[in-house]
Amino acid sequence: VDWTDAERAAIKALWGKIDVGEIGPQALSRLLIVYPWTQRHFKGFGNISTNAAILGNAKVAEHGKTVMGGLDRAVQNMDNIKNVYKQLSIKHSEKIHVDPDNFRLLGEIITMCVGAKFGPSAFTPEIHEAWQKFLAVVVSALGRQYH
């Protein structure tokens, strides 16, 4: 992927403003609520039977932060995202059997949470476009090891 200087700057500046402890839990909770079939991958997280249970589930919140930590690795390694996610892609493909489209869904929800948090003055169309490109590369890398 070729990144322009403006895209790199936009992604890094936006990332620097994101509170992973807020956006991560929000996004993963919303994924589990809006797309309930994704819950099957989180059976070990305890009670996720209702929206309130999901929103109050500490394991969901913690895993949301973990997901955002994975995005941090991508932000820090924008020229090597495929390799950054190679082992994680294998794990999600061969061990957890996650539908790779779920990565796209989560990326869309993360984008909605970020957009709602910062609004149009900070999440401008240019920043949004760079962010979408970044997440598309991440989603592609996560799906790369699927057969």
UniProtKB/Swiss-Prot annotation:
InterPro entries: Globin (IPR000971), Globin-like_sf (IPR009050), Globin/Proto (IPR012292), Hemoglobin_b (IPR002337), Hemoglobin_oxygen_transport (IPR050056). Involved in oxygen transport from gills to the various peripheral tissues. Red blood cells. PROSITE patterns: GLOBIN. Belongs to the globin family. Heterotetramer of two alpha chains and two beta chains. Residues 2-147 form the Globin domain. This is Hemoglobin subunit beta. GO terms for molecular function: haptoglobin binding; heme binding; metal ion binding; organic acid binding; oxygen binding; oxygen carrier activity; peroxidase activity. Keywords: Heme, Iron, Metal-binding, Oxygen transport, Transport. It comes from Leiostomus xanthurus. Heme b binds at H63, H92. Pfam families: Globin. GO terms for cellular component: blood microparticle; haptoglobin-hemoglobin complex; hemoglobin complex. GO terms for biological process: hydrogen peroxide catabolic process.
